[in-house]
Curated annotation (Swiss-Prot):
Gene3D superfamilies: Ribosomal protein L17. Part of the 50S ribosomal subunit. Contacts protein L32. The keyword Protein transport does not apply. GO terms for cellular component: cytosolic large ribosomal subunit. Belongs to the bacterial ribosomal protein bL17 family. Keywords: Ribonucleoprotein, Ribosomal protein. The gene is rplQ. One of its GO terms (biological process) is translation. This is Large ribosomal subunit protein bL17. The keyword Mitochondrion does not apply. GO terms for molecular function: structural constituent of ribosome.
Amino acid sequence: MRHRHAGKLLGRSYEHRKALYRNLMIALIEHKKIKTTLAKARAVQPEVEALISIAREDTPHARRMALSKLASKEAMRKLFTFAPTTYGGRNGGYTRITKLGPRRGDGAEMALIELI
């Protein structure tokens, strides 16, 4: 029984899931919106929200924390160029998930996750 175990496993090991979240976050920061499955979008949304909340204050410590989550200096730089100005006065709610319907090949529910 998985009582009181928060978070989605997505049928992956811990390392695989961590790499998936990192890649989705980097893609979302670079492209502002990505098309993925609904389960992946819902799983990565809190991670992205927390990352943007960290990036709102541009301090060396915040940059180190963001880099530890992203592992991409280019994505970290891009995040810190737009996050303080765009989301400075906003407390949460930085992303939006829009359902797109089922995928043709396997019927997986697709979604668009985008930065507001």
